[in-house]
């Protein structure tokens, strides 16, 4: 996806402008409503094992935050569909609210500063290798999520 995708995740263009640009780019004659409905298909299921780990970390006194590249279309959908995510996190940082997106170094630096975290005391998980590299460049321990066992396997060693 092109620059309109990145602009949308930074909150720089409206949902309607994004839908129009993407439909034009992909030669899809969709209405805004059709596009919006299809755009939510990316959400397939909650990961209860990860939610449980997040709760356990918080019970142990760790701060758990989520950093997500997202957009207004998704933020009107997933909080209602998956309230467990918000309940399991101390804070959720969204690219569209911050005006920056992963893998830009400044987004990781922003979260570190806002949370009072040092890179060496932070662990970051993502399923995108570019985002892992971006976090690594600011000194954050970063784990590429390859499948549903990556996060539970990592914390099985740490939490036991």
What are the residue ranges of the model-derived segments?
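N-terminal helical cap/lid subdomain that shapes the substrate entry/recognition surface
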Residues: 1-52, 59-60, 71-75
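Phosphate-binding loop of NTP-binding sites
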Residues: 66
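A generic secondary-structure signal
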Residues: 25, 53-56, 114, 157
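Structured helix-beta-strand junction loops
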Residues: 60-61, 88
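Asp-based, Mg2+/Mn2+-dependent phosphohydrolase catalytic module
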Residues: 71-72, 76-160
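A generic structural motif
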Residues: 61-63, 140
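Anion (oxyanion) recognition and catalysis
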Residues: 58-59, 136
């Amino acid at each position: 996806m092109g620059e309109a995708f990145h602009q949308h995740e930074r909150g720089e263009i409206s949902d309607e402008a994004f839908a129009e640009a993407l439909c034009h780019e992909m030669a899809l004659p969709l209405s805004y409503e059709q596009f919006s409905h299809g755009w939510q298909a990316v959400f397939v299921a909650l990961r209860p094992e990860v939610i449980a780990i997040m709760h356990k970390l918080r019970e142990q006194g760790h701060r758990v935050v989520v950093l997500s590249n997202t957009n207004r279309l998704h933020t009107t959908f997933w909080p209602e569909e998956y309230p467990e995510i918000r309940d399991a996190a101390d804070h959720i940082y969204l690219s569209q609210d911050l005006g920056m997106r992963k893998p830009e170094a400044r987004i990781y630096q922003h979260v570190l500063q806002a949370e009072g975290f040092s890179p060496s005391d932070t662990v970051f998980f993502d399923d995108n290798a570019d985002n892992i590299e971006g976090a690594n460049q600011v000194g954050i321990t970063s784990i590429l999520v390859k499948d549903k066992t990556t996060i539970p396997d990592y914390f099985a060693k740490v939490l036991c």
